[in-house]
UniProtKB/Swiss-Prot annotation:
Substrate binds at K153, D185, T222, K223, F224, E225. The keyword tRNA processing applies. One of its GO terms (cellular component) is tRNA methyltransferase complex. PANTHER family: 3-DEOXY-D-MANNO-OCTULOSONIC-ACID TRANSFERASE/TRNA GUANINE-N 7 - -METHYLTRANSFERASE, PENTACOTRIPEPTIDE-REPEAT REGION OF PRORP DOMAIN-CONTAINING PROTEIN. This is tRNA (guanine-N(7)-)-methyltransferase. Residues 1-23 are annotated as: Disordered. SUPFAM superfamilies: S-adenosyl-L-methionine-dependent methyltransferases. It comes from Pseudomonas syringae pv. tomato (strain ATCC BAA-871 / DC3000). Residues 1-11 have a biased composition (Pro residues). S-adenosyl-L-methionine binds at E74, E99, D126, D149. Pathway: tRNA modification; N(7)-methylguanine-tRNA biosynthesis.
Length: 244
């Protein structure tokens, strides 16, 4: 079955003398993809149980999960392998995943069903909308951004999700002491992330040399990362703690 989730239509042309509505530059591009049986099962059976929708007011996640627990949000979980592994390893913590591509959402939810996890919830929409509308200020213990699209070409750098405005938004959602954890396998993007975050107010770099941290034990190594290591590709982890 093909993915039926499509991007919103283009804005209509403005009438003469009419001001065009502002349109935020997005850091992702919707891609159609074929769904496996398992992914479709995840969407059909898992989304009613573990899927969340955009709201106009912050969500009470204590009510959603039925408890108060340390809470992590991951933006762009891909096929969900890392988030599933972390959630299974830490049942005492709650995990919120955000991903726009339906095959990945289906795979993640199928994994939640198969493993019998209860500490995971999933959004299948724009992460910026989720942060702005659904996540209360000062509520997250950790926000993870692993291997986001580096948008290699200079003219596309404005599409990179890590920007000063994004750093400020993440900071507003983290508790004091909460951590923004990023990872990338693209050296120039690692440098760009470091440059943005080093001047972002209210953060402290957890690296001893104010650069990159060694790969944290809690971040699972993906098959993609293992292949890259064999080819001599590097991976850079950055951890910035909210200090005020």
């Amino acid at each position: 079955m093909t993915d039926t989730h499509v991007p919103p239509p283009e804005l209509p042309a403005a009438e003469e003398g009419e001001e065009r509505p502002h349109r935020r530059i997005k850091s992702f591009v919707m891609r159609a993809g074929r769904m496996t049986e398992g992914q479709q099962r995840g969407l059909d059976q898992g989304r009613p149980l573990f899927g969340l929708s955009l709201t106009d007011t912050p969500v009470d996640f204590d009510q959603v999960f039925g408890r108060s627990a340390p809470r992590t949000l991951e933006i762009g979980f891909g096929m969900g392998h890392s988030l599933l592994e972390m959630a299974a390893a830490s049942p005492e913590q709650d995990f919120i995943g955000v991903e726009v591509h339906y095959p990945g959402v289906g795979a993640m939810l199928n994994g939640v069903l198969t493993q019998g996890l209860t500490n995971v919830r999933v959004y299948d929409c724009d992460a910026i909308e989720v942060l702005n509308r659904c996540i209360a200020d000062n509520s997250l213990d950790r926000l993870m951004l692993f291997f986001p699209d580096p948008w290699h070409k200079s003219r596309h750098h404005k599409r990179r999700i890590v920007q000063p405005e994004f750093a400020a938004l993440v900071r507003s959602k983290l508790k004091v002491g909460g951590v923004f954890h990023m990872a990338t396998d693209w050296g120039p993007y690692a440098e760009y992330m470091l440059e943005v975050m080093s001047v972002a107010p209210g953060y402290r770099n957890q690296a001893e040399d104010n650069q990159y941290v060694p790969r944290p034990a809690e971040r699972p190594i993906t098959k993609f990362e293992r292949r890259g290591e064999k080819l001599g590709h590097g991976v850079w982890d950055l951890k910035f703690e909210k200090v005020d």
